[in-house]
């Protein structure tokens, strides 16, 4: 039997809880850690956080503790890009898969630091674009070329206060028809 892929779940919101359940059900993966930011989740079993049976993986908010774990990959689910967290993860030799679509470090001043972190840790960073979901972005993008939109109904279950100004401008939030 091949070795299981060792996963750390970073953040434990709605999408992450689903990811934890998928990992628990997948015979080729093993959850080895869970990083939380809310004190009330610190020390709680990751399975319980995800609404399933305990997995024997205690969530922590201790950065040094989580980075010391032996893991192949970190599933990173922040509300926005957080380079101050990504750099130490990459330096520790863990590959990062993120639900953030906006990772484009070449266009950011932190690109050299990200590149150095990946080289030092022999790691990689991949943004999948699931945060908070592609479907609403497509509806908004499609409507941007229309001259007569009668209705678009989009429901999101996630606070949007942390969206970047670039994102808001890209989709025309707060603008008039002109």
Predicted features and spans:
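Short loop/edge segments at beta-strand edges and connector loops
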Residues: 61, 127-129
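Short beta->alpha connector loops at strand-helix junctions that form conserved
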Residues: 99-102, 129
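Short, hinge-like loop/turn segments at secondary-structure boundaries
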Residues: 48-53, 113-117, 143-146, 169-172
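A short hydrophobic/small-residue beta-strand
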Residues: 95-97
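Rossmann-fold NAD(P)-binding glycine/threonine-rich loop
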Residues: 101-124
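N-terminal glycine-/serine-/threonine-rich beta1-alpha1-beta2 phosphate-ribose binding loop
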Residues: 1-92
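Conserved anion/nucleotide-ligand pocket segment
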Residues: 130, 135-178
């Amino acid at each position: 039997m091949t070795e299981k892929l060792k996963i750390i779940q970073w953040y434990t919101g709605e999408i992450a809880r689903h990811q934890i359940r998928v990992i628990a059900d997948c015979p080729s993966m093993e959850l080895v850690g869970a990083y939380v930011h809310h004190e009330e989740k610190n020390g709680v079993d990751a399975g319980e956080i995800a609404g399933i049976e305990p997995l024997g993986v205690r969530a922590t908010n201790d950065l040094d503790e989580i980075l010391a774990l032996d893991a192949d990959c970190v599933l990173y689910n922040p509300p926005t890009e957080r380079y101050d967290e990504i750099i130490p993860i990459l330096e520790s030799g863990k590959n990062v898969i993120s639900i953030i679509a906006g990772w484009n470090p070449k266009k950011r001043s932190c690109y050299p630091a990200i590149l150095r972190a990946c080289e030092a840790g022999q790691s990689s960073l991949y943004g999948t674009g699931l945060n908070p979901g592609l479907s609403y972005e497509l509806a908004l993008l499609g409507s941007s070329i229309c001259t007569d939109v009668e209705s678009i109904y989009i429901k999101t279950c996630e606070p949007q206060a942390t969206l970047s100004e670039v994102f808001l401008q890209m989709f025309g939030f707060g603008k008039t028809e002109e």
